[in-house]
From Swiss-Prot:
Record has Transit peptide as a keyword: no
Example GO molecular function: TBP-class protein binding
Descriptive protein name: Cullin-associated NEDD8-dissociated protein 1
Family statement: Belongs to the CAND family.
Length: 1230
């Protein structure tokens, strides 16, 4: 420390030198010292350093002054508080100095100090004291109005301080407001402007009283309307306040908007511009409160969008031949200058109107149909705008409209969406000709910016409406070529033109482009050869698509591609051979050449084998190998049967080696490539090549990656079909892995189907030691030997399905094996595991093969219904249902008879019936529907809920067989006197709804409202199942319920409330325990709300929705967890609405995070509380992603509470890490 002090005193001495270079060097060295974390200054050194730095601020040399100011930053954090106060005092005094240079340098110094203070959320006393000290001096400097330059600096610093530390100055807010308000009438516009900025920062942290005073002052001054100049200022101020604190100004809009509307009619362009800008900020920041005024705002914007008093567009408006009239463009360009007028401010009004319409379109999704009637035609008619900046904003507004129209969820554009009448998409479709007509002239404009806007517009249009431009390609192609050939155009314009062409090529049928190929190929080929890599890369994408256009392989085409092949091949091979090009260009050149060989390979002659050799080289390169594998897969699948023999000998072993690389995408790509090679080139592959691949397969067949396993099994299936002689190699480790995977509980879905296909293909190859009985023993052996216990029930199902697959492939083996399984079930010495497997296998075999010849089968299965093992009983129930599907006339009447005569076995027999209804064909079941229906209705009033649920599922699935007859019958039971019957039919409806189109959908749409009326049922349980059914509809087929939301939501929200009358106390021994019978229904209601966020957001009043989310944040553990998830979704989906409610949301989150569990609680309680805290923190992290959320005083206070609590800080940090790593994973293109 002594040496540091000595070094610093040495520097201080040099700073007094008369030589400016000495002073500069010494100050620079001091700066370096102060930036070191290790530096510690004693009191004396601190005092001397501060004194010297302040002295150097008045140095004659400007460079020394600048360095001294920079030293203030690190110095503030290294010296004691009273020294910081000395610095601030001196700087404030110097700010009022007569010397201009000293004033300037001192104000920079103050900004530096303020910038270095710890944020308000840290709760630092230093920050608070310094800010208070500065505030008093600044307010007096601002209020004096003596020297404008001092005022401007003071206002600047005040704004800076309020934005960083506003929360610490709450006591000063009234005096700050008092000093700022008079400045709004300053004769200097610069002073007014900075005052508005300062007020904008003030309203983010000030208390309500100050905020009300400010708004009342502005409203009163606006009502007086003393002078046009101050009125403009007040409107600007209101807009600024709305931008910074929209959630606070909302309640005053009823008073503000009529005033602003009135001022729009005053003949003052500047005032109009500010009024429309104010509307824009209201629309973006006060979505709920502005809603009643949106139509008024749209009308004003539409009026002023065309406001151009100094220019006459008439000659262009009705040009019927505009599509062909390219010649007249230059004359129009020349006329601009005659009308151009330096005093003409009308363009600013038009720009404000376009931006405000953009805001309306972006925030009011529910008004889309209305926008297409009014806003869309108006914007299209303004694409001809003469002022470039305005035109760009008009285009941007239309882009926003298109983006809002793009279907976010697939059901929006599904044919089964069943929304009648004009939809936004059909309205857009009808306006496409007008859009193209308006864009056509703009695409030949000199302005690069305009042409870029046109390309962005066309790209978005085609993304929203694929195929929309089919009729208009002849008009658009010349415009695209114009930009590609334009020598003066920028790289970005060419990239946009190419990217637009690519999207158009991808989304229209090839025939549309055939007349234009001759014109398109030369400019695209030229772009492939462009020296700028980004243009080349984009052009290669277009070339690849052009290849598919000139010779589509998936449809007949009479187009002659021959004249273009040489040019396309030559430009691509040049890029493929080049070694020193950009990575993306390398990859796209490989993909493009792959497409050329796939579609045109039969025309390449000797070039083909040379090109394939280059592919072989690229396969050996780590950077290009994955792209090359994909290209080879494409070529190998080509119907042209490309000759790959020259590269297979060397290529297949390389591909085999990729299977052991630690790169998942490469493994998957390679398995696809090998699969297609085996299918199409088996006669060119040698046994050695295939053995090399088989050696690599065992590690890939594992439950740790089911997708890779599935691909590997599919490859083996292909091998069994086309190259059966190679299978003798698999009996060792590959088969062990396969059998191991069959026993895995994770084997389901696609991987299980692949496994079944494989066993069926394998068993018919006649390979030694891999016959039917061999494979059967391998699959079932462990169950019989009891050597390895199969812990998971799913494993038995998988083995049984494999047994059935083998038996279907070898039907002659069936009777003996079925007989054996029947004996296994009968045998009293069989373990439960053996019985379980035997029953499931009988079920799976019987599903596909008629087992009615096995006379004792029925009695054996019914006997198993009496087993003490629940799993055996369940398997017997499944087996009976599954066997019945194999021969309905034999088994279904038997099952129905048993249900009637065996009340004790009813539950199991109903499960058998459910299996029959779920799996049998509609035609097969039709004759039995009436009998089954009558039987089910007898049991739908059963008091046992489990039985009722099975009955409901059967009723629902049966209804799908004959919806026209059965759905009205179901509806009839809604008036049943039994609440059990009502809950059964409402649950049944849930099983008629699926996520794909079905014949029942239109019928269901007409009557689902009747079923949902049970949300008003007096019985709690009926209301709960109605919510579950509603949730299923909202999730799987939202179009069923979208139009009913206005009537359903009040009842849904009603069920989110805690009901005191449903809470009761139960005595458990010496303890009293509270039971809430309403919890389940509240949970169901909140689950519906969560689903609606994804499927019907545009139909929700989000503020009403948030009211109930707020209640949920204070509810039971399960509901809190759901509402935390909702907050995370809401932060992304409607951030501005959440921001308005932020202060009300923070409190319950804070309460959850700071709740302590009683020390004597059980471990579960601690775990639950911990999970609650983590979920609440996730919600906080999501809220903080909303721009300006951290500016809320309550939120910043909560943040400082989190950072000062080690436990909460640790949780918060880990959640932020998790979310950033999730984002990185989602970016992983593999």
């Amino acid at each position: 420390m002594a040496s540091a002090s000595y070094h610093i005193s040495n520097l201080l001495e040099k700073m007094t030198s008369s030589d400016k270079d000495f002073r500069f060097m010494a100050t620079n060295d001091l700066m370096t010292e102060l930036q070191k974390d290790s530096i510690k200054l004693d009191d004396d050194s601190e005092r001397k350093v501060v004194k010297m730095i302040l002295k150097l601020l008045e140095d004659k040399n400007g460079e020394v002054q600048n360095l001294a100011v920079k030293c203030l930053g690190p110095l503030v954090s290294k010296v004691k508080e009273y020294q910081v106060e000395t610095i601030v005092d001196t700087l404030c005094t110097n700010m009022l100095s007569d010397k201009e240079q000293l004033r300037d340098i001192s104000s920079i110094g103050l900004k530096t100090v303020i910038g270095e203070l710890p944020p308000a959320s840290s709760g630092s006393a230093l920050a608070a004291n310094v800010c208070k000290k500065i505030t008093g001096r600044l307010t007096s400097a601002i209020a004096k109005q003596e020297d404008v330059s001092v005022q401007l600096e003071a206002l600047d610093i005040m704004a800076d301080m309020l934005s960083r530390q506003g929360g610490l100055l709450v006591n000063f807010h009234p005096s700050i407001l008092t000093c700022l308000l008079p400045q709004l009438t300053s004769p200097r516009l610069a002073v007014r402007k900075r005052t508005i900025i300062a007020l904008g920062h003030l309203v983010m942290s000030c208390g309500n009283i100050v905020f009300v005073d400010l708004i009342e002052h502005l409203l009163s001054e606006l009502s007086k309307n003393d002078s046009m100049s101050t009125t403009r200022t007040y409107i600007q101020c209101i807009a600024a306040i709305s931008r910074q604190a929209g959630h606070r100004i909302g309640e005053y809009l009823e008073k503000i908007i009529p005033l602003v509307v009135k001022f729009c009619n005053v003949d003052d362009d500047e005032l109009r511009e500010y009024c429309i800008q104010a509307f824009e900020s209201f629309v973006r920041r006060c979505p709920k409160e502005v809603y009643p005024h949106v139509s008024t705002i749209i009308n004003i914007c539409l009026k002023y969008l065309t406001y151009d008093p100094n220019y006459n567009y008439d000659d262009e408006d009705e040009d019927e031949n505009a599509m062909d009239a390219d010649g007249g463009d230059d004359d129009d360009q020349g006329s601009d200058d005659e009308y151009s007028d330096d005093d003409d401010m009308s363009w600013k009004v038009r720009r404000a109107a376009a931006k405000c319409l953009d805001a309306v379109v972006s925030t009011r999704h529910e008004m889309l149909p209305e926008f297409y009637k009014t806003v869309s035609p108006a914007l299209i008619s303004r694409f001809k705008e003469r002022e470039e900046n305005v035109k760009a904003d008009v285009f941007h507004a239309y882009l926003s409209l298109l983006k809002q129209t793009r279907p976010v969820q697939s059901w929006l554009c599904d044919p089964d969406a069943m929304e009648q009448g004009e939809t936004p998409l059909t309205m857009l479709q009808s306006q496409v000709p007008n859009i193209v007509k308006a864009l056509h002239k703009q695409m030949k404009e000199k302005s690069v910016k305009t042409r870029q806007c046109c390309f962005n517009m066309l790209t978005e249009l085609v993304n929203v409406l694929p195929g929309a431009l089919t009729q208009h390609i002849p008009v658009l192609v010349p415009g695209i070529i114009f930009s590609l050939n334009d020598k003066s155009s920028s790289s970005n314009l060419k990239i946009d033109a190419l990217s637009c062409l690519y999207v158009i090529l991808c989304n229209h049928s090839p025939q549309v482009f055939h007349p234009h190929v001759q014109a398109l190929v030369p400019p695209v080929v030229a772009c492939v050869g462009d020296p700028f890599y980004k243009i080349t890369s984009e052009a290669l994408l277009v070339t690849q698509q052009l290849v598919k256009v000139i010779r589509p392989l998936d449809q007949p085409s009479s187009f002659d591609a021959t004249p273009y092949i040489k040019d396309l091949f030559t430009c691509t091979i040049k890029r493929l051979k080049a070694a020193d090009i950009d990575q993306e260009v390398k990859e796209r050149a490989i993909s493009c050449m792959g497409q050329i060989i796939c579609n045109l390979g039969d025309n390449l002659g000797p070039d083909l084998s040379n090109t394939l050799q280059i592919f072989l080289e690229r396969l050996k390169n780590e950077i290009t190998r994955l792209t090359t594998v994909k290209a080879l897969t494409l070529i190998a699948g080509s119907p042209l049967k490309i000759d790959l023999r020259p590269v297979l000998g060397e290529g297949v072993p390389i591909l085999a080696s990729f299977l052991r690389k630690n790169q998942r995408a490469l493994k998957l790509g390679t398995l696809s490539a090998l699969d297609i090679l085996i299918k199409n080139y088996s006669d060119s592959l040698t046994a050695a090549m295939i053995d090399a691949v088989l050696d690599e397969l065992p590690p890939l067949i594992s439950e740790s990656d089911m997708h890779v396993s599935q691909m590997a099994i599919s490859f083996l299936t292909t091998l069994a079909k086309v190259y059966p002689s190679s299978l003798s190699k698999i009996s060792g480790s590959i088969l062990n892995e396969l059998i191991g995977l069959v026993r895995s509980p994770l084997l389901q879905g696609g991987a299980l189907s692949a496994m079944l296909d494989f066993f069926q293909a394998l068993v018919v190859t006649g390979t030694n030691n891999l016959g039917y009985m061999d494979l059967l023993r391998m699959l079932t052996g462990p169950v019989y030997s009891q050597s390895t216990a199969l812990t998971h029930k799913q494993s038995y199902y998988s083995i049984a399905k494999c047994v059935a697959a083998l038996t279907r492939a070898c039907p002659k083996e069936g009777p003996a094996v079925v007989g054996q399984f029947i004996q296994d079930v009968k045998n009293s010495r069989s373990t439960d595991s053996i019985r379980l497997l035997a029953l499931l296998s009988l079920g799976e075999v019987g599903h596909h093969i008629d087992l009615s010849g096995q006379l004792e089968l029925k009695s054996v299965i019914l006997e198993a219904f009496s087993s003490p093992s629940e799993e055996v009983k369940s398997a017997a129930s499944y087996a009976l249902g599954s066997i019945s599907v194999g021969n309905l006339p034999e088994y279904l009447p038997f099952v129905l008879q048993e249900i009637t005569s065996q009340p004790k076995r009813q539950y199991l027999l109903l499960h058998s019936l459910k299996e029959i209804i779920s799996s049998a064909s509609v035609v097969g079941l039709k004759p039995y529907v009436e009998n089954i229906w009558a039987l089910l209705l007898k049991h739908c009033e059963c008091a046992e809920e489990g039985t009722r649920n099975v009955v409901a599922e059967c009723l629902g699935k049966l209804t799908l067989i004959d919806p026209e007859t059965l759905l009205p019958r179901l509806k009839g039971y809604l008036i049943s006197g039994s609440s059990y019957a009502r809950s059964s039919v409402v649950t049944a409806v849930k099983f008629t709804i699926s996520d794909h189109p079905q014949p029942i959908d239109p019928l269901l749409k007409n009557c689902i409202g009747d079923f949902l009326k049970t949300l008003e049922d007096p019985d709690l349980n009926v209301r709960r199942v109605a919510l579950v059914t509603f949730n299923s509809a909202a999730h799987n087929k939202p179009s069923l319920i979208r139009d009913l939301l206005d009537s359903v939501l009040p009842h849904l929200y009603n069920e989110t409330k805690v009901r005191k009358e449903l809470i009761r106390e139960v005595e458990m021994g010496p303890f009293k325990h509270t039971v809430d019978d309403g919890l389940d229904i509240r949970k169901a209601a909140f689950e519906c709300m969560y689903t609606l966020l994804d499927s019907c957001l545009d139909r929700l009043d989000i503020f009403e929705f948030l009211n109930h989310v707020e209640d949920g944040l204070k509810d039971h553990y399960d509901i809190k967890m759901l509402t935390f998830l909702m907050l995370v979704r809401l932060s992304t989906l409607c951030p501005s609405a959440v921001l308005q409610r932020l202060d009300r949301l923070v409190e319950p989150l804070r309460a959850t995070c700071t709740t302590k569990v009683k020390a004597n609680s059980v471990k579960q309680e601690f775990e639950k509380q911990d999970e609650l805290k983590r979920s609440a923190m996730r919600a906080v992290a999501a809220l903080l992603t909303i721009p300006e959320a951290e500016k809320s005083p309550l939120m910043s206070e909560f943040q400082s509470q989190i950072s000062s609590n080690p436990e909460l800080a640790a949780i918060f940090e880990s959640i932020q890490k998790d979310s950033s790593s999730t984002n990185l994973e989602s970016m992983d293109t593999s």
